């Protein structure tokens, strides 16, 4: 038994734009299946980096969780399961899904083979949790895949201001452990700013943070020391992250 894959990674129209561990991001440089009617539009799309991408996962005895509905095809001795560990785990993950809007019950694949996700115009961002103090919270809808040694749970905003007037949501999906995770984002890695805090403070005017270390304290505060100062600055309320950890923020667009 065995398999070989042709005209995929070795395709002259395909580029590997990112590769970490078992995860590899495949990008189609041009849409060669376009018609005469949409050729001009597809040309300008490719010039502006609007290209189809797929996440390729190579398993050699490892296991991985993938967002439901994301898998397009897989080959090899790969087995799929729900990854649930009894009724208690099922109830816990069902509750987490209700409060975050993000299902924590992800299809689990393990074995030896290759898995490829559905094509997407979005960008795949591969992050290592070792760079996030072992735990990162992410905005809803960004999760794509992770190694199964990464635990998916919910994290509740601790501060009253963050719960009541913050725009990050009351609960967020939290990824904990040691391993790599993949986020599906509207912007490429080149337009994401990484800020490492060392017992310091980051203030952001708006929902530009897409991921942050769980141990950071999140609050919503006035931009100035007084109401008049905040009004004069025109900034009003800002999202504040304090402590030691990492924040990943968008530089050009709003969530």
PLM regions: where:
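N-terminal, charged/glycine-rich beta-strand/loop interface patches
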Residues: 2-172, 176-178, 186-207, 212-219, ...
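Conserved small/polar residues in nucleotide/adenosyl-binding loops
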Residues: 253-255
């Amino acid at each position: 038994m065995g398999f070989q894959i042709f005209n995929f990674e070795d395709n002259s129209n395909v580029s590997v734009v990112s590769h970490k561990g078992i995860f590899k991001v495949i990008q189609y440089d041009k849409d060669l299946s376009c018609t005469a009617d949409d050729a001009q539009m597809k040309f300008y799309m490719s010039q502006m980096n609007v290209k189809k991408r797929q996440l390729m996962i190579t398993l050699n005895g490892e296991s991985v969780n993938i967002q439901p509905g994301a898998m397009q095809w897989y080959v090899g001795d790969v087995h799929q399961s729900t990854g649930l560990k009894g009724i208690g785990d099922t109830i816990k993950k069902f509750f987490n899904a209700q409060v975050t809007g993000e299902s924590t019950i992800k299809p689990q694949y393990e074995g030896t083979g290759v898995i490829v996700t559905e094509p997407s115009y979005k960008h795949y961002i591969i992050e290592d949790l070792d760079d996030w103090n072992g735990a990162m919270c992410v905005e809803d809808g960004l999760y794509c895949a992770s190694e199964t040694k990464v635990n998916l749970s919910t994290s509740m905003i601790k501060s009253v201001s963050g719960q009541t007037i913050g725009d990050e949501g009351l609960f967020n999906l939290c990824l904990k452990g040691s391993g790599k995770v993949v986020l599906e984002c509207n912007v490429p890695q080149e337009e994401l700013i990484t800020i490492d805090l060392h017992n310091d403070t980051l203030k952001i005017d708006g929902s530009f943070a897409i991921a942050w270390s769980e141990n950071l304290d999140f609050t919503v505060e006035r931009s100035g020391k007084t109401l008049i100062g905040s009004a004069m600055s025109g900034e009003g309320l800002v999202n504040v992250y304090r402590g030691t950890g990492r924040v990943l923020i968008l530089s050009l667009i709003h969530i």
